[in-house]
UniProtKB/Swiss-Prot annotation:
Localization per record: Cytoplasm
Cited function: Modulates RecA activity.
Any Gene Ontology CC annotation: cytoplasm
PANTHER family cross-referenced by the UniProt entry: REGULATORY PROTEIN RECX FAMILY PROTEIN (PTHR33602:SF1)
Gene3D superfamilies tied to this protein: Winged helix-like DNA-binding domain superfamily/Winged helix DNA-binding domain
Species classification: Bacteria, Pseudomonadati, Pseudomonadota, Gammaproteobacteria, Enterobacterales
GO biological process entries: regulation of DNA repair
Record-given protein name: Regulatory protein RecX
Pfam families per record: RecX_HTH1 (PF21982), RecX_HTH2 (PF02631), RecX_HTH3 (PF21981)
The family this protein is said to belong to: Belongs to the RecX family.
Main location: cytoplasm
Originating organism: Escherichia coli (strain SE11)
């Protein structure tokens, strides 16, 4: 950090840091708070910003007010991103909970997203195990464990086998 930067008020330094963090990708409010509170790596090692709790609150409020920080937008984008990577609804819910998103906001976004979880689970199975799907019990159990680990619900997993039999 340069000498002129260290003389800037803590609020201005925090705001600059928040905008830089949010310019890379969307964050939840809790993630942003955690990153702002973490020490900055400077040329001479970690450096703390001497900011008050009021400075942090003002920065968060400014980010909300100017559209840089929006938990509902973050949740929608996070769900879309993780589902494209093949993760199921249970895992996505758990990850959002870890990021400080309320259960109500998560459930609202999950209802609003237009994702066919059963089709997504089937795509994951065919990508990993190929067509046709195995009929041997031990292979079915292996696939079930894989999908449960990826965060799919048991009803979606069972639908794969029901639809496969048709």
């Amino acid at each position: 950090m340069t000498e002129s930067t260290s003389r800037r008020p803590a609020y201005a330094r925090l705001l600059d840091r928040a905008v830089r963090i949010l310019a890379v990708r969307d964050h939840s409010e809790q993630e942003l708070r955690r990153k702002l509170a973490a020490p900055i790596m400077g040329k001479n090692g970690p450096e703390e910003i001497d900011a008050t709790a009021e400075d942090y609150e003002r920065v968060i409020a400014w980010c909300h007010e100017h559209g840089y920080l929006d938990d509902s937008r973050f949740v929608a984008r996070f769900i879309a991103s993780r589902s494209r990577k093949g993760y199921g609804p249970a895992r996505i819910r758990q990850e959002l909970n870890q990021k400080g998103i309320s259960r109500e906001a998560t459930e609202k976004a999950m209802r609003e997203c237009d994702i066919d979880w059963c089709a997504l689970a089937r795509d994951q199975v065919t990508r990993k195990y190929g067509e046709p799907l195995p009929t041997v019990f031990s292979e079915k159990v292996k696939i079930q464990r894989f999908l449960l680990y990826r965060g799919y619900l048991m009803e979606d997993i069972q639908d794969i086998w029901r639809n496969f039999a048709d």
